[in-house]
């Protein structure tokens, strides 16, 4: 039987009677459970990543789908891919119910698939549903249709055996237990979702060759700090002085291109 663990009563009571220190320590105690829950989900995360990579090598994309906090986290992770890895913003796309962070659009079971078809989704793409409850109609409808069309589906949820997981080729079930404030899934569930999204996109981008050693050699040079960081990467890699390294970087636009051009 499907049980919404994420909606179960908090392990703590009379929160309004607690001191600030007690509240903070309680929240921190609960947050420490999140990393362990994510650790237990690593085999499923690995399974999803290893299926995403070959699809992306063929031109596939990742679509995150969610509502509320879950949707916003998908949009956030997607927005970090271009500056961090120098990839186009069309490669990882976050879709949120309503098109913007609108709270009530999540009950439309058809709209999610409509948004995917508007973006010409293909069987090279991957759809990842994000919902702590695992019951969001907007997400479930999109995943169902995607799967019917032979598209890889994954999900991230805080409840076992959810309706959303039933539509996933790979279900990442991150069981963090009841929230500190009962039902407030922006807390532990949201923290765990962000950790897993980081793991998915970072490991995918590494597998796609967007990291060298441990460095973001394809990052966008969008501010002075990143230009300085990129320059120091080139100094370390090629042994040039700072001025020459910076000039080389600015000429070619990325650390990788600058290093490759210098070595030709």
PLM feature spans:
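Cofactor-/ligand-binding subdomain signature composed of acidic, glycine-rich
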Residues: 1-37
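N-terminal charge/polar-biased segments
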Residues: 1-16, 117, 148, 240-264
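A short, well-structured juxtamembrane/interface segment
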Residues: 40-55
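Glycine-rich phosphate-binding loops that contact phosphosugars or nucleotide phosphates
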Residues: 63, 67-195, 204-208
């Amino acid at each position: 039987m499907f049980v919404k663990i994420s909606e179960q009563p908090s392990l703590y009571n009379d929160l309004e009677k607690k001191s600030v220190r007690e509240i903070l320590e309680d929240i921190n105690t609960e947050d420490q459970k999140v990393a362990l829950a994510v650790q237990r989900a690593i085999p499923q995360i690995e399974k999803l990543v290893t299926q995403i990579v070959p699809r992306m090598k063929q031109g596939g994309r990742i679509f995150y789908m969610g509502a509320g906090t879950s949707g916003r986290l998908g949009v956030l992770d997607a927005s970090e891919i271009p500056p961090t890895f120098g990839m186009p913003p069309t490669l990882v796309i976050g879709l949120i119910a309503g098109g913007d962070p609108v709270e009530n659009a999540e009950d439309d079971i058809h709209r999610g698939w409509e948004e995917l078809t508007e973006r010409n989704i293909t069987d090279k793409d991957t759809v990842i549903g994000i919902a702590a409850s695992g019951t969001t109609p907007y997400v479930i409808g999109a995943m169902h249709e995607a799967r019917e069309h032979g598209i890889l589906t994954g999900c991230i949820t805080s409840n076992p055996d959810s309706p959303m997981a039933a539509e996933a080729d790979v279900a990442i079930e991150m069981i963090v237990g009841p929230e500190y404030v009962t039902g407030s899934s922006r807390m532990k569930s949201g923290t765990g979702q962000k950790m897993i999204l980081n793991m998915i996109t970072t490991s995918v981008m590494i597998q796609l060759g967007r990291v060298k050693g441990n460095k973001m050699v394809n990052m966008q040079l969008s501010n002075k700090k990143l230009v300085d960081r990129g320059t120091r990467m080139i100094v370390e890699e090629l042994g040039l002085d700072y001025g020459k390294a910076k000039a080389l970087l600015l000429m070619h636009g990325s650390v990788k291109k600058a290093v490759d051009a210098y070595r030709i």
